[in-house]
Amino acid sequence: MSFFEAETVGYVLRIKLAPGASFNGFRGVFCDEKGVEFLKGCVTAVPEKGKANKALIELLSKTLKISGSQISLVSGETDHYKKIYINTVASGEFSAKLSGLIKE
């Protein structure tokens, strides 16, 4: 299982976010007790009034080189565990970009 899944149009990512971190970036993959994988994300923004969620969307936009309007929070608005939807054409090239986030 991977931290992302291709949909008919786009991708759903599972991210475990650490707000208030010392840097913005990704730190590999976290596997929960059920074996579900989450990309570990870190943002310097604090978890107040959606600031950390906004910072995560900006980080994904910058790293994946896509518009922030293509990225939306599906669930986890007030939780460390997030589901993110990316509205883009599912392709091998974009899947490789997502896999590359682990190496960030």
List where the protein language model places each region.
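Generic structural marker for isolated residues within well-ordered, non-membrane alpha-helices
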Residues: I57
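Contiguous, often N-terminal, cationic amphipathic patches that form binding interfaces
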Residues: M1-K49, K54, S72-T78, K83-E104
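Short acidic capping loops at alpha-helix termini that bridge into adjacent secondary structure
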Residues: G68-Q70
